[in-house]
A protein has these predicted regions:
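Active-site-adjacent loops and short helices of periplasmic peptidoglycan-processing enzymes
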Residues: 1-86, 96
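Domain-terminus/edge residues, biased toward the C-terminal soluble/receptor-binding domains
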Residues: 65-69, 77-82, 86-167
Length: 167
């Protein structure tokens, strides 16, 4: 959509009117933090980003997110859009357990789409032994955040850090 194509912030550089594999969009969201990819997926799943946010809120309640409110698919600033560190950890655990087929994407170091290669923004992947995912985020208001995961032996560790001045 034109809305996805014009979206500011991080992008995977989806071209207006192009056809894209769902797998590429998912990788664009996970690896590149592509706001454009988020919107394309939201519109495909629910018809509009607003309807997708409603789906996120309903699903969040169902899986035990008690202090989160979604207003968009990207995390773009909105006074009512919020998520606690605890809810982020619950969501991370559910993604890992419910969608294991997508978890390897969180450990990919880079993704190339439309002849543009972008590195994964997760700094712990290259620095922490056993680190294997998850996701970074940033807004001017909230600062930098990270949901990091690592596996040591049989133990999975999920770490949530929010409000950092730098990553």
């Amino acid at each position: 959509s034109e809305r996805a194509w014009r979206m500011a912030g991080s992008k995977m550089f989806v071209e207006l009117g192009s056809q894209i594999k769902v797998e590429d969009l998912i990788r664009g969201v996970i690896i590149q933090s592509g706001n454009d990819a988020c919107i394309v997926l939201a519109e495909a799943i629910s018809g509009s980003e607003q309807q997708f946010a409603e789906l996120l809120n309903d699903t969040g309640k169902r899986i035990g997110l008690t202090n989160s409110t979604f207003r968009n698919s990207t995390g773009w600033p909105d006074p009512e859009h919020k998520m606690t560190a605890r809810d982020l950890s619950i969501l991370a655990r559910r993604i890992i357990s419910d969608f294991p087929e997508y978890f390897p994407y969180y450990n990919e170091r880079s993704f190339r789409y439309n002849n543009i290669s972008q590195d994964n923004r997760n700094p712990i992947l290259a620095r922490v032994p056993g680190a294997d995912g998850m996701k970074t985020g940033h807004t001017e208001d909230a600062g930098y955040g990270l949901v990091g995961t690592a596996k040591r032996g049989d133990r999975r560790v999920i770490m949530v850090v929010n409000g950092l001045p730098t990553m």
